[in-house]
Amino acid sequence: MISHYIRFKIMTNILLSPEKSENDQELPIRPSYLQEFVGQQQIKENLSVFIKAAKSRNEHLDHTLFYGPPGLGKTTLAKIISNEIGGNFKSTSGPAILKVADLAAILTNLERNDVLFIDEIHRLNTAVEEVLYPAMEDFELDIIIGEGSAARSVKITLPKFTLIGATTRLGLLSNPLRDRFGIPMRLNFYNTEELKKVLNRASKLLDIDLTDSGSEEIAKRSRGTPRIALRLLRRIRDFAAVDGKSRVDKEISDFGLNRLEVDRIGLDSNDYRYLKFIADNYNGGPVGIETIAAALSEQRDALEETIEPYLIQIGLLQRTPRGRVITIAAFEHLKMPVPNQSHHQFNIFNEHE
């Protein structure tokens, strides 16, 4: 048993290493509590109710699932929940939990009211999922110790913890796992005013002199995504500094965004490659996602998670049973002639490779 315990501790140190963001500068501007979090108003209000109710009953918060496009605050909300309920925050990801022993190492090191955050939870393998079910429902862990005739089952009682899962691909989550989350919440794209609030808050924390017009210009071109807005703010600050400007206004924001190849509605060079490929080679589509991925030398997951959601959101792309189709609005935005409408609609129902 001691050797197994040591092995569990070693694996825990690897799997639950402190989470690092894409940019360490993001850490000081992450909100720590719900009242500091901008946007997702209904989610915030509901979470506040659920957290207060759980604390009043001296119970753990029910397991929570955040889903939606990347960059909208799933990880941040998980950390906020941990702060609000006063538990430790432990973070890992679906791909990092390869074996049942990996999961056991994590679960046996949790304490009461801890928050276990699993990013990309849709990528857990089936064997790990099956061990997770009783841990979520009954707070028990069944593991096999030993091999062959010496093998025996050991049941370990776990403390009452809260599992928070995050995924950009809800459809890839198995039904049994999805049904075990008592609080499923979808995060939606931000509007311009919400992004301006995110930018204004960040500019104060980063000591950036950001004007209202500069904030609006960045917000309008940030794809409805706070993570992108904050990244663009930092890069435009660089352009302003090198250009000898003390403040970030609309002029320097527009200049910087153009240099970064971000157009007036937030499309970048990758979006243009995607749209032009379908327009030039398939007359607007339909075309299969695997064909697009191969032609652009991109992973299918990258296209489905980072490029397509925003294009669909703003009405430039449609997913059909036959494949991807770009809309008339997309042709107009590309300043390309719109194909014959009847022919374009007819093609949607004919198979293309």
Curated annotation (Swiss-Prot):
Main location as per UniProt = cytoplasm
Which residues bind ATP per the record? Answer: I29, R30, G71, K74, T75, T76, E137, D138, F139, R180, Y190, R227
Q: Which reaction does it catalyse?
A: ATP + H2O = ADP + phosphate + H(+)
Question: Binding of Mg(2+): at which residues?
Answer: T75
Keyword annotations: ATP-binding, Cytoplasm, DNA damage, DNA recombination, DNA repair, DNA-binding, Hydrolase, Nucleotide-binding
Q: Where is this region: Small ATPAse domain (RuvB-S)?
A: 191-261
Where does the record say this protein resides?
A: Cytoplasm
Question: GO biological process: what's one of them?
Answer: DNA recombination
Annotated region (Head domain (RuvB-H)), positions in chain: 264-353
Q: Which cysteines in this chain are paired by disulphide bridges?
A: none
Enzyme Commission (EC) number = 3.6.4.-
Q: What does this protein do?
A: The RuvA-RuvB-RuvC complex processes Holliday junction (HJ) DNA during genetic recombination and DNA repair, while the RuvA-RuvB complex plays an important role in the rescue of blocked DNA replication forks via replication fork reversal (RFR). RuvA specifically binds to HJ cruciform DNA, conferring on it an open structure. The RuvB hexamer acts as an ATP-dependent pump, pulling dsDNA into and through the RuvAB complex. RuvB forms 2 homohexamers on either side of HJ DNA bound by 1 or 2 RuvA tetramers; 4 subunits per hexamer contact DNA at a time.
Q: Subunit details for this protein?
A: Homohexamer. Forms an RuvA(8)-RuvB(12)-Holliday junction (HJ) complex. HJ DNA is sandwiched between 2 RuvA tetramers; dsDNA enters through RuvA and exits via RuvB. An RuvB hexamer assembles on each DNA strand where it exits the tetramer. Each RuvB hexamer is contacted by two RuvA subunits (via domain III) on 2 adjacent RuvB subunits; this complex drives branch migration. In the full resolvosome a probable DNA-RuvA(4)-RuvB(12)-RuvC(2) complex forms which resolves the HJ.
Domain topic, free-text comment: Has 3 domains, the large (RuvB-L) and small ATPase (RuvB-S) domains and the C-terminal head (RuvB-H) domain. The head domain binds DNA, while the ATPase domains jointly bind ATP, ADP or are empty depending on the state of the subunit in the translocation cycle. During a single DNA translocation step the structure of each domain remains the same, but their relative positions change.
Q: What is this protein called?
A: Holliday junction branch migration complex subunit RuvB
Q: Which organism is it from?
A: Rickettsia massiliae (strain Mtu5)
